[in-house]
Amino acid sequence: MFKLLKFLIKFILTILIIVIIGLVGGCIYLNSAYGINVIDVFNQLKIMNEEINENEYIENKFSNEDLDSSKNISSLNNVINKNGDGTYTIDPDKISMLEEDIYLTDKQIGAIVNEIFKKEMEKNGQEYSKYNPEVKEVTFSNITPTSTYFTYMVKLDCSSIKEEYNTFPFTLLKNYIPNYLYLSMTSSITHLEKPFSYEINYVSTKISKLTDEQTFSFLNTIKNVTQLDFASEIYTSLSTTLINLMIGNENYEDGFTYSLSKNALSGVKDYTFKEENGNRYYVIKRGLI
């Protein structure tokens, strides 16, 4: 978790570096030293600064209603608890015995993973809370009997960085740093032979309103300037964290589904993904007790 948070902050600071080089070093230097088109970079930053209407931009947005509908599943009734102040608590230890497999939509999984993610932040990442990273979307696609594409979107509040770097020359950069970043990543999850064993592989990345091509160009610019592969960093730091929070295994025991299975009487034995009648599901599988 700390690696994830440090990566996100490093990502924002790298944007600062690129802008400084562009303003101080000039177009000719960047083009000759790194092969970077400064005009393209500033256009990309301009797009990243555009205000985003989440209701229009996030196609598969989840809400508390998805937590409530998950709570209505009998086996999860005591796992998902709504507090008096409207917040939620997830307690896998309170799982009831499964009478059948549990089918959860991608919206329900997004809502559950976001709650677990927030609790992890409260426990282990208080110094990063000002950046308020939160899961905004989860979708499943390309579902086969053994694999699926898992796409998520994380929102990061960058406004506090503008307040921290309030001396010259950083004061010149405020207009180039977005208030919020929306990082989207698609990974493939392949189920291996044993229960709760899976392999995660990188597929694609997208940043805010940038197109796929613009995102690739921007990440390539960062790589050229810093020698850091941020697409790989996002994959290893962010994707694996969120997927492990959803599934889990003996190496990541806090994963939601694996935590449910640790209660031997629950009957939870594994996970899978299914598509039925045009609907996509994450399935918590019941085994013989």
Regions found by a protein language model. Give the residues of each.
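Extracellular/lumenal and peripheral-membrane lipid-interaction modules
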Residues: 3-289
